[in-house]
From Swiss-Prot:
It comes from the Bacteria. The lineage of its organism: Bacteria, Pseudomonadati, Pseudomonadota, Alphaproteobacteria, Hyphomicrobiales. It comes from Rhizobium meliloti. The active site is at H157, K161. Keywords: Amino-acid biosynthesis, Cytoplasm, Diaminopimelate biosynthesis, Lysine biosynthesis, NAD, NADP, Oxidoreductase, Plasmid. Pathway: Amino-acid biosynthesis; L-lysine biosynthesis via DAP pathway; (S)-tetrahydrodipicolinate from L-aspartate: step 4/4. One of its GO terms (cellular component) is cytosol. This is 4-hydroxy-tetrahydrodipicolinate reductase.
Length: 242
């Protein structure tokens, strides 16, 4: 069986380097292209060297069109604006678009929806199996408990994290809202400061923290005299590339 040819965009980033390593270790796929933004110091370098490995014979390019044309799929953990552009380009050439980019707004998601009409698009706020299992558990618990139980989504990430709440936190919040048969945006509360008054029944709170960890997430269901906590701890960034 032939190997799946994959392009990694944002190749010099944390997840980009992790993905390049993961592809090298998977016999079912091969790195056919590596893309970085124009002006990046990584452009022209061997993608293997960029990822901290031996040479792989694939040079990092700033021309995604040519890289996509020779691929079966693109792995994308970049920025919302870049992801929107890559999605349109992937649709043009007819390849799979796997999206782990976080911090996207409706305008960005609309581009993914449009692309999904013609190509397979896989998108998640977090690609780890553990977080997605946690989301399923959160949905079930939220469905069982009544609205008198307060829900808080707590998280900690490395200090270079640029979006908050994270995609994983929003995924968990959406799972809690789904369990309560409601919409997250109608009950979302991010951060509290000053005199806020009593908590509104049914709200779902978010409290992001800085640190040096890959990603810790905890969902707390706080009731009268009892508390239920469900959590997931990411110990290695490579789990997002599995």
């Amino acid at each position: 069986m032939s190997q799946m040819r994959l392009v990694v965009v944002g190749a010099a980033g944390r997840m980009g380097r992790t993905l390049i390593k993961a592809i090298a270790e998977n016999p079912g796929c091969m790195l056919s292209g590596a893309v970085e933004r124009p002006g990046s110091a990584a452009v022209g370098q061997d993608a293997g060297f960029v990822a901290g490995m031996a040479s792989c014979g694939v040079l990092v390019t700033d021309e995604p069109g040519s890289a996509f044309a020779e691929a079966d799929g693109v792995l994308d953990f970049t920025t919302p604006d870049a992801t929107a552009e890559y999605s349109s380009l992937a649709a043009q050439v007819g390849i799979v678009h796997v999206v782990g980019t976080t911090g996207m707004e409706p305008v960005h998601f609309s581009k993914l929806v449009r692309a999904a009409r013609t190509i397979p698009v896989v998108q998640s706020g977090n690609m780890s199996l553990g977080v997605n299992i946690l989301a399923a558990l959160v949905q079930k618990v939220a469905a069982i408990l009544d609205k008198e139980w307060d829900i808080e989504v707590l998280e900690m990430h490395h200090r270079m994290k640029v979006d908050a709440p994270s995609g994983a936190a929003l995924l968990l919040g959406e799972a809690a809202a789904s369990g309560r048969q409601t919409i997250l945006s109608d009950h979302y509360v991010a951060g509290r400061d000053g005199y806020t008054g009593c908590r509104t029944v049914g709200t779902i709170g978010f409290a992001p923290c800085a640190g040096x960890v890959v990603g810790d997430h905890k969902v707390v269901f706080a009731g009268a005299g009892x508390r239920i906590e469900l959590s997931h701890i990411a110990e290695d960034r490579s789990l997002f590339a599995q």
